Regions:
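Helical hairpin unit composed of two closely spaced alpha helices linked by a short loop
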Residues: 323, 333-355, 359-360, 364
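Short glycine/threonine-rich loop-to-helix capping motif typified by GTGT followed
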Residues: 342, 368-372
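Short alpha-helical functional segments enriched in proximate histidine and acidic residues
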Residues: 330
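Catalytic-core elements of nucleic-acid end-processing and repair enzymes
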Residues: 396
Length: 476
């Protein structure tokens, strides 16, 4: 009887804790109460590690982000910063001042107009562009990935980093402490012995009950000499080249940027370097003056536990609410928060062309089931869903009207929006947006549309599994 009393006490304590800390997020509270009901003895342990935002609040207080504040006046002076809608090349934006003001005011990274971009649509193209830029580095190379494997392509990156370090180029290398947990020590040691500076980003220390395990760095950044930057969905591994038979062809999107917005990719890396290493890099040569090589308007948005605003989620929500003609989304994991979910439904019933591409086969069965749980109600409002059949689609792209497109590291899910360190580039009515739109149309041609009537007839067992996983969706 004593153990039953103990279970009851723990249950009551957990319930009170969850209701106290999660009252502002009812869906999250329901998910945790569901776990508590099913697993009362281990629920609190999981909640301790995964749910609470103590560590997040600590990171915000540290002010670890936006390290370039000391350089702000200098950087703004040497950048073509756009502060008013009249400065935009995009005539459509003059009718969307509310969204423009939101983007300007909610992100400390300004919108800049002196950029040239290149959309990269697969691993082969992306890795070639990255490695070529790295080989020509003169001052520094900054490399940061969520997943970095020691396979064939990983060794090619290693070779270039080592060669450039021996030539005197400063090479800094970050990988996430969970996403790249299996990166061999021998691989890291070889890099370090050659002069490459390496750090894990917030590696969890289970012996000390470290809550940082919930806050992962999902960013993929390469910056070369402060002049060329890369951001998008591609990690470093042979699977991103389609070399894993179980996965097959890997469809992804990355963006190469030259120009003023590289400053803010650099700033994101330096913020992460500070959190990973404790070193505050304040070298002015990390932000060299740029020769204006293009006139594309780009804004870099970063979000994570070190930020007050959930900037990427708020950008997506704001863009969806002003859409007039189309909302096209590509995402490997579709677990929208309530705001995004309602915005999609309202857009569809208002006559906006809403199309969403998701994988036919996912690399996560649990997440895939949770994603499907959102499909039927959205189909009933007029949203069109397509399942990519050519292989696995991992791109994270949002296109709204002829107004803007985003390419980045954030999935359309709650973990990316509210917990992970993420990075997104927003492009405005330029050649990059045209390329993203053309790629989306091609991806549709390699996909099958989900028919509402057929989807309604899916097996009861699948519907049950979807319901159960959806209850966990705020945690996935």
């Amino acid at each position: 009887m004593l153990w039953l009393l103990l279970v009851l006490i723990v249950f009551i304590f957990q319930t009170g804790t969850i209701l106290l800390f999660e009252f502002r997020k009812p869906s999250k509270a329901v998910a945790w109460l569901f776990i508590l009901f099913c697993f009362p003895l281990i629920g609190f342990v999981v909640y301790y590690f995964v749910a609470q935002d103590y560590q997040k609040r600590k990171m915000v207080r540290k002010g670890g982000s936006q390290l370039f504040r000391e350089f702000r006046e200098r950087l703004w002076a040497q950048s073509k910063v756009i502060e008013h809608v009249e400065q935009m090349h995009n005539p459509h934006f003059k009718h969307q001042e509310r969204l423009f003001n939101q983007l300007i005011r909610m992100s400390e990274n300004p919108l800049t107009g002196c950029n040239r971009t290149r959309v990269l649509t697969n691993g082969e193209e992306t890795f070639e562009a990255m490695l070529t830029s790295m080989k020509h580095a003169q001052h520094h190379i900054h490399v940061e990935f969520y997943i970095f494997r020691s396979d064939e392509i990983g060794r090619k990156f290693q070779e270039v980093m080592i060669r450039k370090a021996r030539e005197g180029v400063k090479v800094r290398f970050i990988v996430d402490g969970v996403g790249s947990y299996n990166l061999p020590y021998s691989f890291i040691r070889t890099c370090s012995e050659a002069g490459v500076e390496f750090h894990y980003f917030l590696p969890p220390f289970f012996a000390t009950l470290d809550r940082r395990i919930n806050y992962r760095n999902h960013r993929k950044i390469v910056v070369v000499d402060g002049m060329i930057g890369f951001v998008g969905g591609i990690n470093v591994g042979d699977d991103y080249l389609g070399k894993y038979p179980k996965v097959g062809f890997w469809r992804d999107t990355h963006l190469q940027i030259e120009g003023d917005s590289v400053y803010f990719l650099q700033n994101a890396f330096l913020s992460d370097w500070k959190l990973a290493s404790g070193e505050r890099l304040m070298d002015v040569n990390l932000f060299p003056p740029h020769t204006c090589t293009g006139d594309e308007e780009v804004q870099i948005l970063s979000s994570g536990p070190d930020q007050v605003w959930d900037t990427i989620q708020e950008m997506c929500f704001g863009a969806l609410t002003v859409a007039k003609k189309r909302i096209w989304i590509t995402t490997p994991y579709f677990i929208p928060d309530p705001g995004i979910y309602e915005a999609l439904k309202l857009a569809a019933v208002s006559g906006v062309d809403v199309k969403i591409i998701i994988p036919y086969q996912s690399d996560s069965k649990l997440v895939h089931l949770a994603s499907l749980s959102y499909v039927q109600e959205l189909l009933e409002t007029g949203v069109e869903f397509y399942q990519y059949r050519k292989g696995f689609i991992h791109a994270k792209v949002v296109i709204v009207d002829d107004l803007l497109g985003s390419v980045g590291t954030a999935n359309m899910d709650m973990r990316s929006f509210f917990y992970n360190f993420e990075l997104t580039a927003v492009v405005f009515a330029n050649s990059a947006l045209e390329r993203l739109s053309a790629d989306f149309v091609e991806d549709i041609s390699n996909s099958s549309r989900i028919d509402l009537n057929v989807f309604r007839r899916r097996p009861r067992s699948q519907k049950t599994a979807e319901i159960l996983t959806r209850m966990l969706s705020p945690l996935l």
